């Protein structure tokens, strides 16, 4: 697999709707203010976080169980920023909707601006033929509250394309993946 450049990302997004909405360059300012950048970079695409957040709280003193997850463990927030409590986490989603080609795998890495503040972004790979808004997980590893900004860059997507003779036999769509077509912040499913 080879990593794909800005030219490929631009072409696939503009001609095939791989990323919507799509920003062909890097946006570093909004309303005259500096922001955490988003848009196309040399070998990736920096995604934005939407205004919907789910902040984890343990008010029910429950055990976190991915097979029996309690939606009541989250507080819903809609706003231009989200404060994550110390040593806690929040879920959000990308502004962008993705349609991944069959010969492509996407890996997500957090942006250094957040990582240098102790805020880690986690996303599993976007598999071939998956589509939807990406659910983002932000971990606040610090002993202090941490702020996440909506509509600004939070993570970078790297696109890897298989050789023509090595495209997967079964895509995410083929196997009926449980997160196919997700919109909004999606909680764990089994």
Curated annotation (Swiss-Prot):
Its EC number is 3.5.4.13. NCBIfam families: dCTP_deam. Pfam families: DCD. InterPro entries: dCTP_deaminase (IPR011962), dUTPase-like_sf (IPR036157), dUTPase_trimeric (IPR033704). Belongs to the dCTP deaminase family. Pathway: Pyrimidine metabolism; dUMP biosynthesis; dUMP from dCTP (dUTP route): step 1/2. Catalyzes the deamination of dCTP to dUTP. Homotrimer. One of its GO terms (biological process) is dUMP biosynthetic process. It catalyses: dCTP + H2O + H(+) = dUTP + NH4(+). HAMAP family: dCTP_deaminase. The keyword Nucleotide-binding applies. Keywords: Hydrolase, Nucleotide metabolism, Nucleotide-binding. The active site is at 137 (proton donor/acceptor). This is dCTP deaminase. DCTP binds at residues 111-116, 135-137, 156, 172, 182. GO terms for molecular function: dCTP deaminase activity; nucleotide binding. It comes from Stenotrophomonas maltophilia (strain R551-3).
């Amino acid at each position: 697999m080879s990593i794909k450049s800005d030219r490929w990302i631009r072409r696939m997004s503009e001609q095939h709707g791989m990323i919507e909405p799509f920003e062909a360059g890097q946006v570093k300012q909004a309303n005259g203010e500096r922001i955490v950048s988003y848009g196309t970079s040399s070998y990736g695409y920096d995604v934005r976080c939407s205004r919907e957040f789910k902040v984890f709280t343990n008010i029910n003193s429950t055990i976190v169980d991915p097979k029996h997850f309690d939606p009541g463990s989250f507080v819903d927030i809609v706003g231009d920023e989200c404060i994550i409590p110390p040593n806690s986490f929040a879920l959000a989603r990308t502004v962008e909707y993705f349609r991944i080609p069959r010969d492509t795998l996407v890996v997500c890495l957090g942006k250094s601006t957040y990582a240098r503040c102790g805020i880690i972004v986690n996303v599993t790979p976007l598999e071939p033929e998956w589509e939807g808004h990406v659910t983002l997980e932000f971990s606040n590893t610090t002993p202090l509250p941490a702020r996440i900004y909506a509509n600004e860059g939070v993570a970078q997507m790297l696109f890897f394309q298989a050789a023509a003779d090595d495209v997967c036999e079964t895509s995410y769509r083929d196997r009926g993946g449980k997160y196919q077509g997700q919109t909004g912040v999606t909680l764990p499913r089994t």
